[in-house]
């Protein structure tokens, strides 16, 4: 009855079955027994976000950094962590986290951040630098390196924040999502046209439908859970 791992695993199983409310109860029980059980907090946060309980969900999601199996470690930048304070006249460093798909998903938050800060620097996966720079020309993008680019260690930068943590300040409720439903990524026009012509020539008069995404870094189980059948 006091085995926290069992309650956490029960929560995972219930979530897989679509029993989200019961999963929440299981995670709460695990946390009741061990209040610093990071995995249960993180799992609870993801379900709360899924159900639209955004404020509490984002708060629980912050436990991800303390999870034993969280694949991407924190970046140790010297600037203070941004806590949602006024950014007028301030600069902020945003560092991307997790996989390339997560970086693209969380980039949706950058448009909202632009509205409250005029000086934003983003550290991201090198393959996304040109893509993001084209999509957000007002923001400076720097490829992720180890150790970090020395420019990002500058004490003149006022704050730093992981990109996934922007949600608790910029997406606190359903209205904040509804107000930011516009597209935010810009493709390369020339390359898009080249690809379009190539497949049109191959398809002749047939209808073209193309959707392709493969997560090479994910485990097979995770990949299957993110995929759909044809």
Stretches with model-predicted labels:
Residues 1-230:
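Alpha-helical solenoid repeat scaffolds of the TPR/TPR-like class and their adjacent stem/linker regions
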């Amino acid at each position: 009855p006091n085995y926290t791992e069992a309650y956490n695993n029960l929560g995972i199983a219930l979530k897989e079955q679509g029993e989200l409310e019961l999963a929440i109860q299981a995670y709460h029980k695990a946390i009741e027994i061990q209040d610093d059980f990071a995995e249960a907090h993180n799992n609870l946060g993801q379900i709360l976000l899924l159900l639209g309980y955004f404020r509490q969900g984002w708060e629980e999601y912050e436990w991800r950094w303390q999870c034993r199996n969280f694949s991407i470690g924190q970046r140790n930048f010297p600037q203070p962590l941004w806590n949602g304070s006024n950014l007028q006249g301030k600069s902020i460093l945003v560092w991307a986290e997790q996989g390339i798909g997560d970086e693209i998903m969380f980039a949706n938050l950058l448009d909202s951040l632009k509205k409250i800060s005029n000086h934003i620097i983003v550290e991201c996966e090198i393959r996304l630098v040109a893509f993001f720079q084209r999509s957000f020309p007002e923001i400076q993008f720097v490829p992720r390196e180890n150790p970090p680019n020395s420019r990002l260690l500058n004490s003149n930068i006022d704050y730093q924040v992981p990109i996934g943590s922007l949600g608790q300040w910029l997406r606190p409720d359903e209205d904040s999502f509804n107000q930011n439903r516009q597209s935010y990524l810009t493709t390369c026009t020339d390359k898009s046209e080249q690809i379009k012509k190539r497949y049109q020539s191959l398809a002749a008069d047939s209808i073209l439908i193309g959707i392709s995404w493969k997560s090479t870094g994910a485990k097979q189980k995770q990949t299957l859970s993110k995929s759909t059948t044809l």
